[in-house]
């Protein structure tokens, strides 16, 4: 009689433990899904902000190019224009990263590719903001 109770209690404990493990796995998978969704939302927002920033920078660079185009330029202004043209090419390559860096990314895994594009964006956007700021400052100084 004692043996039947021991087996019954052991079975109840084992089934309760199995249910708790299953519930833990479900809650972990639900958390993973929620984290992934929030990461997608953050990436989407970041992509939209970056796209807007690129559009604004392209517009500013084109405006500066058209301003400098119709008058004689000094050597310094010529160098700024060369840099702006290079920046415009780099910004265009960010719009189509598959085509622009197809040769660069052969043989890399996905993490390395993501790091490469992040580094490329930082490498491009840092000098671009400085260049645009300097060019706008010089333009305002000349106008003022």
Curated annotation (Swiss-Prot):
It is found in: Secreted. Expressed by the skin glands. Residues 19-43, 73-122 form a propeptide. Transmembrane segments: none annotated. It comes from the Eukaryota. Its main location: secreted. Pfam families: Bombinin. GO terms for biological process: defense response to bacterium; defense response to fungus; killing of cells of another organism. Residues 1-18 form the signal peptide. InterPro entries: Bombinin. The modification Leucine amide is found at residue 143. The keyword Secreted applies. Keywords: Amidation, Amphibian defense peptide, Antibiotic, Antimicrobial, Cleavage on pair of basic residues, Cytolysis, Fungicide, Hemolysis, Secreted, Signal. The keyword Secreted applies. One of its GO terms (cellular component) is extracellular region. Belongs to the bombinin family. Maximin-3 shows antibacterial activity against both Gram-positive and Gram-negative bacteria. It also shows antimicrobial activity against the fungus C.albicans, but not against A.flavus nor P.uticale. It has little hemolytic activity. It possess a significant cytotoxicity against tumor cell lines. It possess a significant anti-HIV activity. It shows high spermicidal activity. This is Maximins 3/H15. It comes from Bombina maxima (Giant fire-bellied toad).
